[in-house]
Swiss-Prot record:
Residues 104-166 form the S4 RNA-binding domain. Keywords: Ribonucleoprotein, Ribosomal protein, RNA-binding, rRNA-binding. InterPro entries: Ribosomal_uS4 (IPR022801), Ribosomal_uS4_arc (IPR022802), Ribosomal_uS4_CS (IPR018079), Ribosomal_uS4_euk/arc (IPR005710), Ribosomal_uS4_N (IPR001912), S4_RNA-bd (IPR002942), S4_RNA-bd_sf (IPR036986). This is Small ribosomal subunit protein uS4. It comes from Methanococcus maripaludis (strain C7 / ATCC BAA-1331). PANTHER family: 30S 40S RIBOSOMAL PROTEIN, 40S RIBOSOMAL PROTEIN S9. The keyword NADP does not apply. One of the primary rRNA binding proteins, it binds directly to 16S rRNA where it nucleates assembly of the body of the 30S subunit. It holds the Pfam family S4.
Amino acid sequence: MGDPRRLGKKYDTPNHPWIGERIQSEREISQKYGLVNKKELWKMETQLRNYRRQARKLISDTTTQGGKEAVQLFNVLKRYAILVEQEPTLDHVLSLNIESILERRLQTMVYKKGLAKTAKQARQFIVHGHIAVNGKRVTSPSYLVSVAENDAIEYVPNSPMASENHPERTAAVSEENQ
C-alpha cells in the first residue's frame, strides 16, 4: 500500500546549458560511442565524478579505514578495467577521463569485438536481445562489462544473428577481411 518512494536521478545535468565547447565535445563523444542522448553521457560522467570525489576524500583520510576503502575503490575500478595500472594510486583515479568508462560499455565492446558494423548497430543488436554475456541475454547497452566477461560476449544461441550466413554477419565479416 502507499506510493513507492521517488527514485533520485542517477545523473547531474550541466550547470550552464549553452556552453558551446561542452556541447561540441558531448556531440563528438556521443557520435563516437553511439550514445542516443546526452543523459547517457551525463550518467557516465556522474559515475566518474563520484569515483573522483571518493578518491579526493580518501587522499585526506590517513586512517586504516581510509586505506581499506582505497583498496576497495581500486578493486572495483580494476574489475571493470577502468583503472589498468598494476600499482594504482589515488592520483591515477583522479586522472581518469570519461572515455575510460565509455570503453567498458557493452555497446562499445560489441562494436570493438566486430559483432556489429557500427556502434549504433551494436546498440540495436543489444536492445533487440541478440547479444549475451556469459550465456545470459543482456538488453542494456550501458551494461559495464567486467574483465572476467570480456571473452564471454557473443550472440544469443537461438538468435537469428547466431547463424554464420546471416546477411548482417556476412557483411561484417567481409568488411573485416578487406
